[in-house]
Amino acid sequence: MSAFVYMLRCKDDSLYTGWTNNLEHRLAMHKAGKGAKYTRGRGPLTLAYVEELSDQESALKREYAIKQLPRSMKLKLCSSWQKQNTEK
């Protein structure tokens, strides 16, 4: 079963990183204010990055790795992802 690592850009321009098995459902939860405590009250939220991985373990490891990156590297990941997804 695949899993996803994602980043959300919050209204205050901060980035939230998380993982899920069901991306659409998780995004709906965040937008409804029922996601992570960090994102509550920081809307509107926009999807800034998504990476699909083969399983939960891989997603958790990747989420941790992304969270360790400096903000500048996170922004580069987001920029690269957005370029790839606007060209399609």
Segments from the language model and where they lie:
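GIY-YIG nuclease catalytic motif and its immediate N-terminal context
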Residues: 1-74, 78-88
